[in-house]
């Protein structure tokens, strides 16, 4: 048979696919309900899979000018480098998927020095990558359709972009033509309104990080 092709063969963090599986494996490994009936051998297999998954997470954490940052939504399964998925999902740093990845790492018991470094680096990236003074608002456009746009908001909490450039860390947007753009208004109506381009996922990272620091210091 031909080798499988397409982005779905890559390491996929997009839409929390891998992290959801890792959470499931953790429940199996811990014998959490409804997996209490599973034998010890199955629980051990789940733990081995978790260990491999964590190793993969650490290998795929992107370095930007020699500094650990966060993750792309998908990575090449051979090289671990950031990879393209759909036409509008270019290799990048993800301000969405990376949140749940680092939160997962913070939930590990007895984290290694490498895991701790990974967490600290990712949290610092979230701090450095805050987008302040904006919000996403709905409005009725000139065609009478409900639309979305970026608007100023000095009192709003920080936001994070779905995609940041690998080299510059600049937030960007992209339409189905695969062309990178830097303003939400520059992409078409369908993608502008059909994708989560900006989010506040970093808030959950900060909350979990505060609790994690307390646990680590004990």
Task: Please report, for each region that a protein language model flagged, where it lies by residue.
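Active-site cradle of extracellular carbohydrate-active enzymes
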Residues: 1-20, 24-25, 37-92
């Amino acid at each position: 048979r031909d080798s499988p092709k397409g982005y779905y063969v890559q390491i996929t963090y997009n839409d929390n696919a891998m992290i959801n599986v890792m959470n499931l494996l953790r429940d199996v490994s811990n014998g959490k309900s409804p997996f209490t009936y599973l034998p010890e051998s199955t629980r051990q297999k789940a733990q081995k899979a978790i260990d491999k998954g964590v190793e993969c997470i650490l290998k795929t954490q992107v370095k930007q000018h020699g500094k650990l940052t966060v993750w792309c939504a998908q990575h090449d399964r051979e090289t671990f480098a950031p990879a393209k998925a759909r036409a509008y999902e270019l290799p990048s740093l993800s301000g969405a998927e990376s949140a749940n990845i680092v939160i997962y790492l913070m939930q590990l018991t007895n984290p290694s020095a490498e895991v701790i470094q990974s967490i600290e680096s990712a949290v610092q990236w979230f701090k450095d990558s805050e987008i302040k003074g904006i919000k996403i608002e709905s409005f009725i456009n000139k065609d009478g359709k409900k639309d979305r746009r970026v608007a100023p908001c000095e009192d709003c909490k920080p936001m994070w972009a779905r995609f940041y450039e690998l080299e510059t860390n600049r937030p960007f947007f992209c339409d189905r033509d695969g062309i990178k753009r830097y303003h939400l208004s520059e992409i078409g109506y369908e993608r502008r309104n059909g994708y989560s381009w900006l989010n506040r996922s970093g808030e959950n990272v900060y909350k979990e990080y505060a609790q994690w620091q307390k646990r680590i210091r004990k």
